[in-house]
Amino acid sequence: MKIAIGCDHIVTNEKMAVVDFLKSKGYEVQDYGTYDHVRTHYPIYGKKVGEAVASGKAELGICICGTGVGINNAVNKVPGIRSALVRDMTSALYAKEELNANVIGFGGKITGELLMCDIIEALLHAEYKPSEENKKLIAKIAHVESKNDNQTNPDFFKEFLEKWDRGEYHD
């Protein structure tokens, strides 16, 4: 499996630990930087990772910044990306199994390299479990990423809200 990874200057050491971990497990790692502690901007690296995954150059992306919030927002702007900011196993597995996440985001200063590696290992062994319901949700997410008239439609999520009201839809 080819894995794209990127970070900002705040978490270069944590990213390198994750890269070493992935290589030790036999994964091909595409490191999009940054490679040092010189101040830089996380959107650059989120975009690079997202483009690698969206183009098929990588099968999974990992984005890391100090809190994870900034780089995860950046990577999610790349069409075709479904990234989840996670800090625990439950969120990571849900992201993969239910939403077929193709990028995972971390706050390296919050989660730390050891927990990141544990979460990544679990994620790599998890598989998307398609269902009619999550296929529809993923389609709605994909629909939102492109500008279209339906985005301003106040009933865009009506189908899901009605199911919720009837007790048919559960988190």
Swiss-Prot record:
What InterPro entries does UniProt report for this protein, alphabetically? LacB, RpiB_LacA_LacB, RpiB_LacA_LacB_sf
Per its record, the protein catalyses: aldehydo-D-galactose 6-phosphate = keto-D-tagatose 6-phosphate
Query: Which one GO biological process term can you cite for this protein?
Result: galactose catabolic process
**Enzyme class label:** isomerase
Record bears the keyword Isomerase:
yes
> Would I find Isomerase among this entry's keywords?
yes
Taxonomically, the superkingdom here is Bacteria
Provide the E.C. number(s) assigned to this enzyme: 5.3.1.26
Q: Which GO terms describe its molecular function?
A: galactose-6-phosphate isomerase activity; ribose-5-phosphate isomerase activity
Keyword annotations for this protein? Answer: Isomerase, Lactose metabolism
Pathway assigned to this chain's UniProt record = Carbohydrate metabolism; D-galactose 6-phosphate degradation; D-tagatose 6-phosphate from D-galactose 6-phosphate: step 1/1
Family, as annotated = Belongs to the LacAB/RpiB family.
Subunit structure comment from the entry: Heteromultimeric protein consisting of LacA and LacB.
Question: What's the protein here called?
Answer: Galactose-6-phosphate isomerase subunit LacB 1
Origin organism is Streptococcus agalactiae serotype III (strain NEM316)
